[in-house]
A protein has these predicted regions:
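Terminal amphipathic alpha-helical/low-complexity segments used for targeting or macromolecular assembly
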Residues: 1-148
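A structural motif detector for beta-strand N-caps
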Residues: 135, 141-142, 150, 154-162, ...
Length: 167
């Protein structure tokens, strides 16, 4: 969990058909198995998805791959469209890969979760509330910070509480 949603939920929000498999380490492969089909979209499980990134990954043609540079300066295999053989080939050598133009956020160390959490909360808030209209904040509540940063789902009962949106 980085921000409000998990890394998987971030990808699912942008990959509309939800069909992708993770490029992950061996011990996580049981929890996140590869979809059993001929052609697959493999994505790097430690990368925080953005709309543009997901669009570029989904648009890959079969047998193609996408590399990216992380903000930490590491070049990674971001996505592969194709078979398990294609994935293995691109994992070993990056010849013929396209380069994603933006730097990406990736969780490579435990502390990355904490360093990226604030910005991810803000980005997730935008995605989750886009096009939705919540209810106004009842007067029995105390608001600290910007009330525009507080979303209350219609029908929720929120009375007599302190809502802190300062940080």
């Amino acid at each position: 969990l980085v921000g409000i949603t998990t890394l998987r939920q971030k990808w699912e929000a942008f990959v509309k058909d939800g069909r992708f498999s993770y490029l992950t380490v061996d011990y996580l492969s049981e929890k996140f198995p590869v979809e059993d089909c001929g052609e697959n979209l493999f994505i790097a499980s430690h990368v925080i998805a953005t709309q543009h990134m997901a669009e570029c990954a989904v648009a890959l043609k079969p047998g193609k791959a996408l590399l990216a540079d992380t903000r930490g300066g590491e070049r990674i295999l971001l996505a592969v469209r194709g078979s398990m053989d294609d994935f293995m080939r691109f994992s070993e050598q990056h010849d013929g890969c396209e380069l994603f133009e933006d730097k990406v956020d990736a969780i490579t160390n435990v502390y990355d979760i904490f360093m990226l959490n604030g910005r991810q909360i803000e980005e997730d808030f935008e995605v989750l509330t886009k096009g939705r209209e919540g209810q106004s904040i009842p007067r029995s509540n105390t608001v600290i910070g910007d009330p525009d940063l507080i979303y209350i789902e219609s029908g929720a009962i929120v009375e007599g509480v302190v809502l802190n949106a300062s940080h």
